[in-house]
Amino acid sequence: MKIALGIEYNGQNYYGWQRQEKVRSVQEELEKALSHIANEKIEIFCAGRTDSGVSGTGQVVHFETNAVRPEKAWAFGTNAHLPDDIAVAWAKQVDDEFHARFSATARRYRYILYCNKLRSAILAGGITHCHLDLDAEKMHQAGQCLLGEQDFSSFRAAQCQSHTPWRNVHHLNVSRIGKYIIVDIQANAFVHHMVRNIVGSLIEVGAGNQPIEWMQWLLEQKNRQLAAPTAKPDGLYLVDVIYPQKFDIPKRPIGPLFLEDGLLNRTLK
């Protein structure tokens, strides 16, 4: 049978999602816990492989198993064998044709900036601290030129292994809640470091170092070296993965934490 899981994890203590030798990964921890419950070796496939330090509240995985267990066992039982910074949010048996990665039609990320002169000890690692008072409205306006299907070479990491820099951005919204700025972006898929590279350049606009039109210019240049440095991984969250309705994949409130849709000034549900 094939099982899908919703996964939440704090990426601070991991070298990314993907299993690697000699370093901790989210995939390895989850596979070990699932293998214990199934009493057989389990290999999982995810919707999106996040980088070192990046967290997820809406990650989706699937695996195949010969073990027959109730859905509660896959959730509660697996959680009992996971470290505190990884958790199963839901479990569901799915059709054989479902694939966590290839069945997905879109991924959604949120990047959280904490704009304050002094850093926060409590929030450390869960947000990116910015000592500048950024202009969220200018950042939002600047980001609108990135909508649609375009060549994102200017926001693509040099080590990106994708065959094409073209991606289709469905929405890019920048909102402020007090001292927090949330960059919310959804696309069919993302090239390597695309969200963090976009955020890095939007920060330059928000700080007043570049005009709103700069983002359009960067996009047209197709040159990563002209854009701003990559934003830190700390504030980035994979918050949702979208699938066709026929798979009936469970939906959770879009977070993370207190940043649910109803609290944001702009949201595309």
Curated annotation (Swiss-Prot):
GO molecular function, one term: tRNA pseudouridine(38-40) synthase activity
Keywords: Isomerase, tRNA processing
CDD domains: PseudoU_synth_EcTruA
Class in the EC hierarchy, top level: isomerase
Family note: Belongs to the tRNA pseudouridine synthase TruA family.
Subunit structure: Homodimer.
Protein's name in the database: tRNA pseudouridine synthase A
Organism: Haemophilus influenzae (strain 86-028NP)
Taxonomic placement: Bacteria, Pseudomonadati, Pseudomonadota, Gammaproteobacteria, Pasteurellales
